[in-house]
């Protein structure tokens, strides 16, 4: 929206451009004069945007948490002479860097476990959570199968699966569940067991499972009052 762009330019020394990021051609025009592109669009647009940036021959860093496997573009990026650093946010991102640093200190690494979660300091019913990034992408954590590594093989686990309780000083008890945050670690690390889990206040898993079970996270259109809508929207 023009008014949103105006607020950005008013508080920072940046140039704002309004463009259709669903159009690869538009993305190519926007990044044409850039030395480095940072992608921070929603996950549904991440893969196509990354492809368009590689098409433009631009080095990029992306944090969009796309559902697609970015490794599918590895050969193409090399062909275009592009360096693309994907999933470089907090988790995945900083968590991956910390794992890499830790593993480098060890002679042998048998197991990698990542626990990550951004939580409000004050719990507020019913969700006891505040989205720190795009709400639609938060919901992906409750529906997208999680890739983990068991016995050296990548396997899929259901979202919200294998809950466990963990205690943290000054925070209290939190619950953890499988999420798709290993990303590149599943291919670059040689540990036979690897997983990432997201932390929430207790009770959150049961609530999200109930919403998912009732179909509210479905992407399939349903008819309501003569119109169609996707429940997740």
For the regions a language model picked out, list residue spans one by one.
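Helix N-cap at the beta1-alpha1 junction of Rossmann-like dinucleotide-binding domains, i.e.
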Residues: 1-4
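Short, conserved SAM-binding/catalytic segment
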Residues: 7-14, 77
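Hydrophobic beta-strand scaffold residues
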Residues: 16, 59-60, 84
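Conserved Rossmann-fold cofactor-binding substructure of NAD(P)-dependent oxidoreductases
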Residues: 18-36, 45
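N-terminal Rossmann-like NAD(P) cofactor-binding module of classical short-chain dehydrogenase/reductase
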Residues: 31-40, 60-62
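Rossmann-fold NAD(P)-binding glycine/threonine-rich loop
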Residues: 63-87
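Adenosine-phosphate binding glycine-rich loop
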Residues: 81-120
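C-terminal catalytic/substrate-binding lobe primarily of soluble NAD(P)-dependent oxidoreductases
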Residues: 105-233
